[in-house]
Amino acid sequence: MPFLMIRNDITKVAADAIVNPANRNLLQGSGTSRAIYQAAGEQELTAACEAIGHCEPGRAVCTPAFGLPAKYIFHAVCPAWHGGFFGEAKQLAGAYHSALELAAEYHCESVAFPLLSSGNYGYPKEQAFRIAVDTITQYVMEHDLTVYLVLYDRGSLAVSRKLFTSVEEYIDDHYVAQNDESYQFGRRRREYVERWEDAALADREYPAQECAPPVFAAAPPPPAAAPMAARSLENLMDNLGESFTTRLLRLIDERGLKDSTVYKQSNISRQHFSKIQCNRDYNPKKKTVLAFAVGLHLSEDETIDLLKSAGYAFSDGSKRDWIVRYCLEQKIYNINQVNTLLFEYDQEQLGA
């Protein structure tokens, strides 16, 4: 754990291992495979693959990464698409799983996959994406491994049209409306100032203060403030609300959940959760708080309270916040589905 989608060139991803979509003879292919060979060094990588010689579809083998910013290349042999009637789904899931097992064997902490079989192999992108997410998610729920799924474009995402349209409408009704209101207020304010400046410039015979609108006129001094009761810093500290760590652990206990279940459902690593657990005054990032809200299946009101305990609040000007609020309202608590929507809108994902 965790699992994140990124938009990048896989040959530039800094991970312990990157995965090459390979053929059974481990020969250089086109597209992503060619890019990996060129970045690693064609002669060295070709020689290493020739020494292995062969690999069956649904399996993966390992070579050094040579010139890549990684330690290893896992060559996962991908199935070509033949209509889905020849065991392609099982082979594709096997290719992912075999590469993930190699990551464990070689003590990798991170591995980066392209979307296997979706290019020249002809696998429908939405189906290929679903198999990738399902297989990776199942694996990282049981292993401490950071997995990146490297995508070039949004066309790879398996977001249903109905859900996407619903999110679009929700954003239009809330995020856009809020920003339009701010824009209208700012525009009215600018128009008012411009009219006042024009009036002042048009009549130079009067002193500036006579041209000023009433809002700038002299005002009587404010009444003296009532003396505030003295409060020591110690008093203030004693009256602090529940800390983020305390509230988080209480919510887990109240639901009768295991810590491991919650941090995995929240796309948080075991090490990260341990840091939170051991520090009552831990100061999390906002995306971490929101990730736990999804992992704990909180309501919007409960999420507001959890955010407040960490010093945050939902922002009307944040598209990410509106997407998360939509998911909470609709009870979409699958962290990968939430992150897929965030990725679709170029927003920071939740979790690690």
Task: Locate each region found by the language model.
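Phosphate/ribose-phosphate-bearing ligand recognition and processing surfaces
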Residues: 80-208
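The alpha-helix within a helix-turn-helix
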Residues: 252, 263, 293
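Glycine-/small-residue-enriched capping loops at alpha/beta junctions
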Residues: 1-103
